[in-house]
Swiss-Prot record:
Keyword check for Transmembrane helix: no
GO terms of biological process kind: translation
Function comment: This protein binds to 23S rRNA in the presence of protein L20.
Classification lineage: Bacteria, Pseudomonadati, Pseudomonadota, Alphaproteobacteria, Hyphomicrobiales
Record protein name field: Large ribosomal subunit protein bL21
Gene: rplU
Organism superkingdom: Bacteria
Species, as recorded: Rhodopseudomonas palustris (strain BisA53)
Length: 124
């Protein structure tokens, strides 16, 4: 089963266990967030939303918050000794899709438990 979700003005095709980077959303690392704007639910017979599928959502675990690559905006006006250089980095949230929910169900899968490293490996 797949879903097409919309977040941050962009659309993503997702299946369970996908890892994707989207624009920053609220949520602490390790928590489950629900993305409610589902445009398409796909299975044997796909369900198209008008504009969204009623009662459908996608549950995802927040893996990380980070910054994207630097984007440089450079403008030069030739023969005028004039230029402008600016750069920025987007705030990014890394998500793992845990499950696709239909009919207003609540997420049944919680966040994954991280395995603790043994003391010998942590010292190295």
């Amino acid at each position: 089963m797949f879903a097409v979700i919309k977040t941050g003005g962009r659309q993503y095709r997702v299946v369970p266990d996908d890892v994707l980077e989207i624009g920053k959303i609220a949520g602490d690392v390790g928590t489950i967030v629900q993305l409610g704007e589902v445009l398409v639910l796909g299975a044997d017979t796909p369900v198209l939303g008008v504009p969204t599928v009623a009662g459908a959502s996608v549950a995802a675990e927040v893996l990380d918050h980070k910054r994207g690559p630097k984007v440089i905006s450079f403008k030069k006006r030739r023969r005028k000794n004039s230029k402008r250089k600016r750069g920025y980095r987007d705030e990014i949230t890394v998500l793992r899709i845990t499950e696709i929910l239909a009919d207003g169900n609540a997420p049944s899968i919680g966040p994954r438990v991280r395995k603790a490293k043994p003391a010998a490996e942590a010292a190295e």
